[in-house]
């Protein structure tokens, strides 16, 4: 199948001798991608590892994972099984399983120095995503479907088969005489994607829908390029984890572009895991235009007027609770922590406002002098232990020697200007 090589060449960004990982469930799509991508990597003197996540949701899942491993071992492909051993929620199981799957895959890739995780989303998956979002009232960004590349923390998710029909993958496996597994949830009418799949779609209809999704993708690329120019002129970010925004610009640009800008800022500052609902962002934009003197909230952020601008800061009530310092963690999906040379057990990381509220109980009689707005103090990260506050780095306060403390760096999981939407 030449389509994979063409797609990966268009995506680019691989090493001369690429090391890639592929998420493989044992279904026809992921098996076909694994075999094809392994050949692609080998032709370039690179290497591929296949990763199967056993969610432990069905009694037969462990046996299925072993079967996949045997198939791939027979082809000389390295394979690892990653187990989701956490307690399972009573509701939202599909969403929880998806989150766990990507977390386990990302952790393996990062720990093994692999920068590229490939998944087997194909043309019909893209069409289903488009139809689901259309029914939900999505705008252009949502109707563009899935990007061919998505940034994750420490790696990128690559979907090289988005233009390839599922039938082509079945035909490839048949030619290879490669068996595959079937996931019963793909036919369960309780799930919206399964209901869409039950509606037969001829090739002409599928090709037309896929072309339409690509058109939306190109529109999204153009909008993102314009948005990046606006963000560069209207928004400044601070390493303490907040943004300052020029409100005058909101009234001068297209309302939809303004809403996309506000959503991008909120995702960056608040660290939300999923895109924001369009109607909520629209209400925020309208509110900021009508009553700019009022503070507002969205997606774990507060939009607060301050000296002719508005600041976007973390909403304390939506923040992660204080937690023990762990090297390499990304606390509250916002602050990266590096360990000190000497372990310091008992240290807790949180925001100042999550600890005692008086200056003396925090560890200083008077708040340190700082150019930062006072309204920001409650959502500044701090280290706490015995006998109280140990450090508030962004205020320049350190009870212990700074070099002996963990380092806290703002590292938003959602960049303000992430890699652009990719259409191949």
Regions picked out by a protein language model, each given a short descriptive name:
Residues 1-133, 163, 167-168, 174, ...:
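ATP-dependent adenylation/nucleotidyltransferase module used to activate substrates
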Residues 78, 160, 167, 207, ...:
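Proline-centered helix-kink/hinge sites
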Residues 15, 46, 112, 141, ...:
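Structured loop/turn residues at beta-strand edges in well-structured enzyme cores
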Residues 90-93, 192-194, 358-361:
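Short, solvent-exposed polar/charged micro-motifs at secondary-structure junctions
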Residues 4-6, 11-29, 47-49, 84-86, ...:
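AMP-forming adenylation/ATP pyrophosphatase catalytic core
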